[in-house]
Amino acid sequence: MKKRFYMFPIILLMMAIFTACDPDNNQEFPGNGTVTGSYEVKSDIQFPMSLFLTGIPEEYAAFKEPLASMVAMRESALAQELGKAEINLGFRKITYLYPSCGVKGDSITLSAVAFWLGYFDNGVWNDLKPENICLMEHYTITSDAETPSNAFALEMFITGNTLTIMPDYIGYGITKEKPHPYLNHDICAINSIDALTYGYDLFNDSSKYGMSPEWKLYLAGASQGAGNAVAVHKYLDTHPDLATKWNFASTNCSSGPYSPVVTIDKYLADGKVAYPVVFPLVMKTMFDSDPDIMKSFTEEMAYSQNYLAVKDEIDRMIAGKEHNTAAINQLFIEKVRKTVDANLADGEIYLTDILSPAMLDKESPICKALYQCLEKNDLTKGWTPVHPMKLHYSSQDMVVPQENSLAILEAFGEDIVTLEHASFPADHTTTCSLWMVDLFSKGF
């Protein structure tokens, strides 16, 4: 299917801009996941592109008519190519459960989605043959409603004619009652490899036509998803037989926390942060994932009195999975931020309003313990990439500092790493949106 049939989502993307278990590798191709078992389909839906158009918010109502016209033109062109009188372009989305392993090495069932393109011909769904596979890692969320299995992922529009696999991660979807291991790159990589394994099996069992014979695997993601994509890249390149079996080609991502150490270093050096929810997310992960390191401390020891006054409320918001990151960050501004001056932007908060003096002291025992946990998840160390990666970033990103991308380049060199700076001064969200446009328009 030719790329011209996907050009209409570019407007949607521009709207977005401006508004640890030990793997045994015992399975045969196509997977080599970390555990054995089988998938379970929870839902299998096919829906036309026009269904998405009906969900455009009222403030963007003016876009509906031109978008509908563009969809109609693409469908007409595809119908002509297929020799059909009329078709309706759409997606097939299958939500499934699959076995993997939890933070403590226990067996766990996780959820993910697999989706690919197709069309309706006289109301009958027809799959199209995907040209490649994309393992797409989703960005940071705190609301279960945002998970790939529960939402209409914008990433569906940017991966072209691919079989795209999107895992929910531990703590979302079927496991929403569990804490999410934020920035635990190793476990997220293993869970993603398992999602890929069983998603591919599911596709082979469900699709009429199968994959194109020369398919490749591409990894992608933005923000937290970028870190997880590079973590999967590490897993594949340190398991070369697995990389070969999966026809691994490259990684393309944006604005990822590849080095949690560098990220926290930058926050501490600046003395302020524009994404305060990162601190409870990180601290909860470290206490849950590394109890041996953090056993001498409590979460309360990490925080200021300002934060402790609302800690229970923030904990409930994170655990309940009903509030997005914007809502939680706003609570920080409203109830935790006490110090305001000319050097602080509207959405920023000084670390002294969030963290205890001990946590702000890199020589203190609790801060050293935190850094020990962060070091375990630093993707700039402990491996040598084989396959190329393209990383988008911005010097104006105050959420995930550019130092992360620069650290990857310094660690692995220009032969492996291509850096793509935002084409104009862009914050975190805009940089990720520009990445979507670039990936959509240029491909992997």
Question: Model segments located where?
Answer:
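C-terminal motif of bacterial Sec signal peptides marking the signal peptidase cleavage site
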Residues: 16-20
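Catalytic-loop region of hydrolases
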Residues: 24-121
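Alpha/beta-hydrolase active-site loop
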Residues: 182-206
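Primarily recognizes the serine-hydrolase "nucleophile elbow" in alpha/beta-hydrolase
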Residues: 198-274
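Accessory cap/linker subdomain of secreted extracellular hydrolases
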Residues: 254-382
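C-terminal catalytic histidine-bearing segment of alpha/beta-hydrolase fold enzymes
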Residues: 265, 366, 371-373, 396-407, ...
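Short beta-strand/loop motif that positions the catalytic acidic residue
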Residues: 385, 390-397
